[in-house]
A protein has these predicted regions:
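Active-site groove signature of glycoside hydrolases
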Residues: 125-149
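Short, acidic/polar
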Residues: 29-42, 113-127, 184-191
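Beta/alpha (TIM)-barrel catalytic core signal, keyed to glycine-rich beta->alpha loops juxtaposed to Asp/Glu
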Residues: 3, 34, 141-271
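Short, flexible, mixed-charge acidic loops at enzyme active sites
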Residues: 89-100, 244-246
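N-terminal binding-site loop/beta-alpha segment at the start of enzyme catalytic domains
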Residues: 1-92
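Structural preference for beta-strand elements that scaffold enzyme active sites
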Residues: 13-17, 48-49, 76-82, 132-137, ...
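Active-site beta-loop-alpha junctions enriched in small/polar residues
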Residues: 21-23, 53-55, 82-86, 138-141, ...
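Active-site mouth loops of central-metabolism enzymes
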Residues: 21-33, 102-118, 152
Length: 271
């Protein structure tokens, strides 16, 4: 692994990091013991940047990340989580867990307001048991998540006027180190970059061996604005990971066309 930095803030991280959605029992159940082994093995291998979110297992991932990182020197790792969803206690029978195979008994709901963002951060700190978060991502303001244009526009406006305002205040007062956007579409990330001053963007699945459309306008804009890119879901949620039993793309079953394309890539790269 190589040392890299988030340019504007000089946060030193490795070029490989650990996204902890799986610790929220994403697609399969993981025990607390297994989760601890994974986190500590990643740390022992030199990974020093860990990302989580309230959504992941409806708080479970944050609990597990915090439970293990609490025991380590706080200066030895960089930690990020996300804002935009709050968690409300719920009857387990009434929770739509989707792809989460278990998790905590809370229902997530969207809130990109100033007050909602401040509350979200405080609740994340309590779940983590860690009072310092380095990077905060404004999470999922995109069509993939919200589907309808009026909802995307509503939450984008709310995030600019509310969530970003809260994060900028925290950054200005050195309570956090960096502001980011965690998003599934580079087009929406571009809109944020044109409106507000972010330090980095966590882009999920849009710059991989299968997709490079973000090269045309998004990457040049990041370079111009000195915004670093954190590439999430580099295996496009499974199809590029080499496991023939997990041919998912964009969190759903891949089409035959995409599967054929991946098989062609394997021949090119001899894997």
């Amino acid at each position: 692994m190589k040392d890299v930095s988030i340019t504007k803030k000089q946060l030193k991280i490795k070029n490989i990091s650990y996204g902890t959605a799986v610790l929220g029992n994403y697609y399969e159940v993981l025990s607390n013991e297994e989760a601890s082994k994974v986190i500590n093995k990643a740390f022992d291998l030199g990974i020093n940047y860990f990302d989580t979110a309230p959504l992941y297992g409806f708080g479970l991932s944050e609990h597990r990340v915090g439970m293990n990182l609490q025991l380590k020197d706080r200066d030895s790792y960089i930690l990020s989580t996300k804002v935009g969803r709050l968690l409300s206690p719920a009857d387990p029978k009434e929770i739509d867990r989707g792809a989460w195979k278990g998790g905590l008994n809370f229902n997530p709901y969207y809130d990109y307001s100033y007050d909602g963002t401040m509350r979200c951060i405080e609740e994340s700190m309590h779940r983590l048991g860690i009072s310092k978060i380095d990077i905060l991502h404004i999470h999922d303001v995109d069509y993939f998540t919200h589907k309808e244009k009026h909802l995307v526009e509503k939450y984008f406006s709310e995030a600019i006027k509310g969530a970003y305002k809260a994060l900028e205040e925290l950054r200005r007062n050195d309570n956090i180190s960096a502001i980011s956007v965690g998003i599934n579409e580079f087009e929406m990330a571009e809109r944020f970059l044109k409106e507000v001053d972010v330090d980095c963007v966590m882009l999920a699945g849009r710059y991989t061996l299968l997709e490079q459309n973000s090269l045309k306008t998004f990457l040049p804009l990041c370079e111009k604005n000195k915004v670093d890119i954190l590439l999430a879901a580099p295996f496009n949620s499974g199809i590029l990971a080499g496991n023939e039993n997990n041919l998912n793309w964009n969190y759903a079953k891949a089409s035959k066309e995409l599967i054929d394309k991946v098989h062609s890539l394997k021949k090119i790269f001899r894997i």
